[in-house]
Amino acid sequence: MKKWKDIHPISWTIIIGTIFGRMATSMSIPFLAIYLTAVQGASASYAGLVIAASSSVGILASFYGGYISDKFGRKNMMLVSIFGWMLVFAGFAAASNLWVFFVVNALNGLCKSLFEPASKALLSDMTEEKTRLLVFNLRYAAINIGVVFGPVLGLYFGSSQSTTPFLVPAVIYGLYGIVLALQFKKHPSLSAPAQSRNMSVREAFMVTQKDYLFTIALVGITLCTFGYSQFSSTFPQYMAQNPLIGNGTKLYGLMLTLNAIVVLATQFPIVHFAKRFSPLCSLMLGNVMVSISMAIFTVSHGVPSIVMIVITFTIGEVLLFSMMDLYVDQIAKPGLKGTYFGAIGFSQLGNVIGPWVGGICIDLFGAGRPIYIFSVLSGITLLGLPFLAFAYRQMKMETTKHRSRLEKPL
């Protein structure tokens, strides 16, 4: 209980705000691909491209967002991005042309990429090392509490048939921003680490680029993200278009809710076990589980199989995302945590390529041929395993060398 009492009030604001923010987002964004294909008449590949626009912009924006938060402080970056988010969701509600959805979702990715590195770095700044794993996982749990209710609300309000439900996230992010601004005013002593203030963006980029272990792991994490992206892009299109699946849109909404429930049920037991090992071990196992979940789709699409797919995928998701922030926090150079949390945003390349490749597979093979669609997607995801294994091996060797130097007699 003492660890819980050590959590800063602003950290609690971010955690609680995340619940409502993700609830609002998950009642709208996951249904966007279905809305674009069913109502707007877009092809599956174009719908995938619109979904990918968010992550595409985020690849570079997250690094700059993290760097700026290191240089000028977390507060301004978080407030600008969260009120920008409010306007973005209002834009979704007003959109009627396909190109507008592309632009607005790109801006959605920009706001997310600026807010998240700054908020994660702020959580790290305000938390003692012994409590950081708890704080990062409370934030992750908050995401999934929101996702338990969001898809159900999305089905109720008809998010796959109208853009009006996007007004709900607009209101919620506006309120979240106001509460956050009041908390910053109440606790005005927050500032950026001093070391990064005199470092140019090019110098900050070179620091992360020359970090060999970080770069190798980043490639593996990107391929994990490729697999993870299929759940919110290819899965809903496949479920809605497969002629053998009745009421696929409703079933997909229930899959999202089951996903969030399984996360909440398994997250802390898995983390309690996984914290005994390197975060890279969790990332490797998570990669394998996500790949297996897609492989199951190649042989069956019945309700029991779908439940098994969601459970397997979700365990992989927990292993990936419960330890990823801790890995970045551990490997980040002093004074550059925002930059490192931003640099991990380059892994969003997987979220750009994933929906696009998934959409192409559906267009190419047809939703009635899951064996081809998900064999390709599962195989690409599994390519991340060798990179993570290599990074783990190198990290283990460096740790051994460091211990040997410390134990060497003078």
From Swiss-Prot:
The UniProt record lists the keyword Iron: no
Subcellular location: Cell membrane
Gene Ontology CC annotations of this record: plasma membrane
Gene3D superfamilies in alphabetical order: MFS general substrate transporter like domains
SUPFAM superfamilies documented for this protein: MFS general substrate transporter (SSF103473)
Protein keywords: Cell membrane, Membrane, Transmembrane, Transmembrane helix, Transport
Membrane topology recorded in Swiss-Prot or TrEMBL: Multi-pass membrane protein
Domain of life of the source: Bacteria
Alphabetical list of InterPro entries matching this protein: MFS, MFS_dom, MFS_trans_sf, MFS_Transporters, Sugar_transporter_CS, Tet-R_TetA/multi-R_MdtG-like
Segments traversing the membrane: 14-34, 48-68, 82-102, 140-160, 164-184, 212-232, 251-271, 279-299, 303-323, 342-362, 371-391
Pfam families reported for this sequence: MFS_1
PROSITE patterns (UniProt xref): MFS (PS50850)
UniProt KW Acetylation keyword: no
GO molecular function: transmembrane transporter activity
Family: Belongs to the major facilitator superfamily. TCR/Tet family.
Annotated protein name in UniProt: Uncharacterized MFS-type transporter YqjV
Gene source species: Bacillus subtilis (strain 168)
Gene of this entry: yqjV
